[in-house]
Every structure is written in structure tokens, then in C-alpha cells.
């Protein structure tokens, strides 16, 4: 593909998705039409419900603005779909600013949304770019049931660390090795989850994770902060005063062709 046309297409996509970001929870699908001769753009997603929903919002918004959109949803974890963006198997995928920053810069110390966005833009390799982040901050959390919080008098993640030997922790398998996952929780709070007490659940804090938490299969779980399951099930989100989980605004990650004369 001609690099200049590719960059032009991504710039047009950026305009559309910036409008989506600005819409918040309102309907982003109304609007005009982009140039009718645009080639296809492929939208991907991670393999959990929220990522698929956001990717579909992106896809429909782009279609409403004249793009021919291909969909490759449920690709897998960040370790799988980031390389797919880089090799142009997909053109864009919904991401989270803080998580993506920790993926490229595990030693980052920034925590606020603006600082995270700036640091992420600097940390990305040259063939990747981010578009306009949404105002929505949907960070990871450590959640427990109300009964567990009451039993152990839990307020913070540090409080849970005192019961490490008794905690069964539910999260996607990659949470065992990611900076913000078990390594970060151990380093910052002393929460030491042994391998036998980690329960791999692949739905990214979705229904299977919530069910495992509420039926006692796990004691604590990684659940996104905006999940409606938190109030619906009276789950308790433990405070994270040491900012293990960074601000995580939803943002489109796109491939950007290397500049070519």
C-alpha cells in the first residue's frame, strides 16, 4: 500500500475516532461521509467483552463515515494483538493508556491521565501511534466480595497482603507476568500469590470472573473499575494508594507506516 495514502487513511480514521471519544456514552454513529474511495480498514479487539464492544463502536462509527471495515475481534491478549497491529494484520485496536504504557515502559512512574498519555506517546515504537483517548478511565482493580472485605477488614490492597497465603486470585493468565499484575502487587504491597493459588480466567474481568468471585472459587479478582458487576454484586474495590494500576483511558492504537520519501 502507498505509504502516503495509508497515512491519509489513518488521519481520517483519527478524526472519526476523536469524535467517538468526545461522544462519551452517547450515540456516535450519526454523521457525514468520508471519501467514498477509501480502502478497507481492519478493526481488531482483545479477547474480552469490553474490548469487543468498544471495537464494534469504532467499526460502526467508521462505517458511518464511509470506511469499509473488516473485523477481527477476540484476537487474544496484548502480547498477541500488538504485533498484529505492527505487521498491519489489523489497523487499529482499542487499548488502555496506562496498561499499554506499562507494556512498553515497565519502569514508568507516572500515574495521572495526562502524564500517562504523554509518556505513552513517547514510549511507543515508531511504527505505532495512539489517537485521541476517551475521557473514560477504566482501570484494573483488585475486587473482593463484601463478605470477604468484612471478614478481613479490608480497605486497601495492602490489607489483603496480610492474608496472601489464603487468597486465591482470579485473572487472565498474562496477569501473572505483567508489570501491573502479580509482580506489581507483590513489589508494592507484598501481596504474594503462589502459583497454585492463581486461577486463570480468560474473560478479562467478565461474567466468568465475577461468577468465580461470588461463588467462592477465588477470593480476589482483577475486574475493570467501570464494570456494572461491581455494584450489581456489591463487590468491594480495594484502594490502590501506591498506584499499581495507572490511569487507563480508552484509546485507539493504530499502526503508522514508517515515513518514506
Question: Which positions does each model-derived feature cover?
Answer:
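Bacterial N-terminal signal peptides that target proteins for export
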Residues: 2-13
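C-terminal motif of bacterial Sec signal peptides marking the signal peptidase cleavage site
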Residues: 18-22
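Bacterial signal peptide processing site
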Residues: 24-27
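Bilobed "Venus flytrap"/periplasmic-binding protein-like clamshell domains
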Residues: 38-70, 75, 135-209, 215
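Beta->alpha turn/N-cap motifs
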Residues: 77-78, 88-100, 115-117, 145, ...
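Ligand-binding "clamshell"
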Residues: 104-131, 217, 228-242
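Short Pro/Gly-enriched coil loops immediately N-terminal to beta-strands
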Residues: 113, 132-141, 240-249
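A bilobed periplasmic-binding-protein/Venus flytrap-type ligand-binding module shared by bacterial periplasmic
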Residues: 140-150, 248-260
Amino acid at each position: 500500500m502507498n505509504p502516503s495514502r495509508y497515512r491519509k487513511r489513518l488521519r481520517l480514521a483519527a478524526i472519526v475516532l476523536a469524535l467517538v471519544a468526545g461522544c462519551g456514552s452517547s450515540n456516535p454513529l450519526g454523521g457525514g461521509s468520508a471519501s467514498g474511495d477509501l480502502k478497507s480498514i481492519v478493526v481488531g479487539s482483545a479477547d474480552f467483552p469490553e474490548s469487543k464492544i468498544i471495537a464494534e463502536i469504532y467499526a460502526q462509527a467508521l462505517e458511518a463515515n464511509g470506511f469499509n471495515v473488516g473485523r477481527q475481534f477476540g484476537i487474544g491478549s496484548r502480547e498477541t494483538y500488538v504485533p498484529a497491529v505492527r505487521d498491519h494484520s489489523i489497523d487499529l485496536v482499542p487499548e488502555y493508556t496506562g496498561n499499554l504504557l506499562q507494556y512498553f515502559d515497565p519502569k514508568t512512574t507516572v500515574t495521572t491521565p495526562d502524564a500517562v498519555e504523554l509518556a505513552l506517546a513517547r514510549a511507543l515504537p515508531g511504527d505505532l501511534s495512539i489517537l485521541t483517548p476517551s475521557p473514560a478511565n477504566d482501570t484494573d482493580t483488585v475486587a473482593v466480595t463484601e463478605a470477604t472485605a468484612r471478614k478481613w477488614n479490608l480497605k486497601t490492597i495492602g490489607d489483603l497482603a496480610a492474608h496472601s497465603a489464603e487468597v486465591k486470585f482470579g485473572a487472565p493468565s498474562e496477569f501473572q507476568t505483567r508489570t501491573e499484575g502479580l509482580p506489581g502487587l507483590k513489589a508494592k504491597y507484598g501481596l504474594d500469590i503462589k502459583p497454585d493459588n492463581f486461577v486463570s480466567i480468560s474473560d478479562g474481568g467478565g461474567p466468568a470472573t465475577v461468577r468465580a468471585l461470588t461463588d467462592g472459587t477465588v477470593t480476589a479478582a482483577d475486574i475493570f473499575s467501570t464494570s456494572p458487576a461491581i455494584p450489581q454484586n456489591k463487590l468491594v474495590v480495594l484502594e490502590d494508594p501506591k498506584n499499581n494500576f495507572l490511569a487507563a483511558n480508552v484509546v485507539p492504537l493504530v499502526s503508522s507506516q514508517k515515513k518514506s520519501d
